[in-house]
């Protein structure tokens, strides 16, 4: 898994950062987990949220995680996460802690079996249609996250 993670990082660095084009690629970036946590806190721990964060804006510290628990200030979220180039897509639902290891393995295997093609198409579709944005304030500065639909604050669905 570690070799796969490193190969993934190199491919993304070449595709997104274009180190030959600018010095901006070398700037420090927040971790994807920090953006996830800060987004949930900014939204005051919503019942659910679904958003995309650009790969180029974060360090991908959650590589290999597809379905997992994410505790934030006493609340727990079930997070469905997938890399859908050029984004990382998150769908978070507030729910009690549950052992999600089996589902995590299943969703990860499904992405591998499909060669990532459906997630790539989803990412390209998100790139075309995600027009609602929000700024998440991190320890490294602001990060823009994208939504396919405007989310109503406090909505259950």
Swiss-Prot record:
Name of the protein in question: Uncharacterized protein C15orf61
Disulfide partners: none
Record's keyword terms, sorted: Secreted, Signal
One annotated Gene Ontology cellular component of this protein: mitochondrion
Compartments where located: Secreted
Superkingdom of the organism of origin: Eukaryota
One Pfam entry name: DUF4528
Residue stretches spanning the membrane: none
Range of residues in the leader sequence: 1-26
Gene: C15orf61
InterPro entries named in the record: DUF4528 (IPR029245)
Native source species: Homo sapiens
